[in-house]
Amino acid sequence: MDHTLLYRPEWKQEWHILRTQATDYKTYYAFPALTRCENNVLVTVKSGQKHWGDEQSSLTQVTLNAPKQQVQDVRVIYEKAGFTPQMGEIVSMPNGDVCVYIDMQQCETNHRTGLWELRSHDGGKTYPVNRPVGVINGIEYGYAMDLIAKGNQVWMLVMTFPYQTGGRDREVHLITSRDSGETWEFCANLKELFGFSFNECALLECDEGFLIFTRGETDRHDRKSSADDFASGQHLVVLDENYRVLRSRDYRATTDFFTLTGRPRLYWIKGELCLFTRQWNEDSHNRMMSCDLFRIDPCTLEILSRVRLDEPRFPRQDGHYPVVYTQDGLLHVITYITCDRDQRETFEQKCDLVQLSYRLDEVLGYGKENA
């Protein structure tokens, strides 16, 4: 099988759920996350002015009726002067609550102020609980990057920062809750366990324990610019239930096509292990990016197929924190994409919240022709 072969879907639909044009290009919609609540899909998205360092911003929730493919509701669920809800990871808890874990930052900086929780008891209609997560085993965490529920237990990937309580450096830790997020406890320091630095990452359950995909980064003590991260590894790691590494693969080292990822997500879809991620090209100045799907063998960690879901659109565009759901034979990818109003601007160019849709059997069938 030619692992470098790139597939492009024949059928694709694009729906701009929230358009910055409707706000006279004042709003920068970015960083979606989602959870499924029966027929509804709850999507959180930052409504700000730029990628980071907003003067003011809010966290918006969009409620989609999945079977009808309609927007049911759009409303702000968090807004506070002086603070930026940079991203809100949303999860359906085992007890039925919907929780949002916000990467809270000071306005006009990317200085984290501690992980923040919103909690709903009515399927995301209201969020009466609004509170800091606080210190967990001596550490206050910032960025929440992924959550999974398995039975009555929940796990979350979170990052430490040296200026927060107990934070020695930028490290990704795995924490867990047995009471639907009311209390949390430490599981593992993944930076120490894996032996390398990384930032954005994805978490998924598997028969052996856990799958974690990591976006490598240069150690901040040695990092001169974001271009340095292009040399970093992009690993898929398998852990057992006791958080011991069983096997791993670095796709930067073992393929000639895998580049620096952005905000990866792992899913089981119809029994297939799927990685969705932004892929930068090697030209870090122009920052041409695509949104790609990789189908992976969970035993060998071999890439079975790669599908280009969205082509690069402009130099120095922003976008592609892909989150997905399926409905009636279609794969729906919710992401954010730079609008095409003014290509002369860079990262302050405004973005739309977008849904890209594909035929599920088509995108999962690529690479199986000669299998």
Model-derived features: positions:
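Asp-box/BNR beta-propeller blade signature and adjacent active/binding-site loops
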Residues: M1-A371
